[in-house]
Amino acid sequence: RRCYDQIYMSAAYAGLPVHVLGSDAGVTAAFNGGTHMPLEDAAMYLSIPETVVLDPADYAQLECITRQLPGITSGVTYTRFVRKGIVKVYEDGSEFPIGKGVVLHESDKDVATIITSGIMVDESLKAYEALQAEGISVRVIDMFTWKPLDEELVIKAAKETGAIVTAENHNVTCGLGSVVSNCLAKNCPTVQEFVGVQDLFGQVGPQDFLMDEYGLRAANIVAAVKKAISRK
């Protein structure tokens, strides 16, 4: 927060290729407490013109992203990530072009789409399994690039499944859900539900406690999917 003016004026406005990495994103700040819990970090960077905002799910994705950063020769990039307790989602050496979402599950029977990123990818995959067990087929997309958004993939999912649920380790105001909602409003108005921190300040506590407290669990995603489907 304190360096925002420098990032905006000295880097972004000047058109310099500055790559910012922010660790302990969202509730993973845990015992750092409310004053040091970045629930709005991506929102600040999303609002700066010509930025790239990234939220990788695991080390393999982070490594691939990092290798691509030198190729971005103007403007600010912001990568938010986690330092500890990361669940492995992808195989080492996997490729993830910046600006393209990753479809993790897809079928012609999908009745909703979960769009997620970061630590919420693991929770979304758990939600997928729970919904499958109930006979509810959903699409799951890892949208690790928040900006520029893969609008083509979002629109395709919206048209084919008719309901969208976004799941993020961030405030739902001005985060991934808002970016997706803007895309849908412009191109393909679609029912959407938002899983994330609901306009609240951070607090101190273990990550597991915080994920329960802020509704960032697979069960919350399952409930949001069912609500979205009921609104179609």
What are the functions of these language-model segments?
Residues 1-113, 229:
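Conserved thiamine diphosphate
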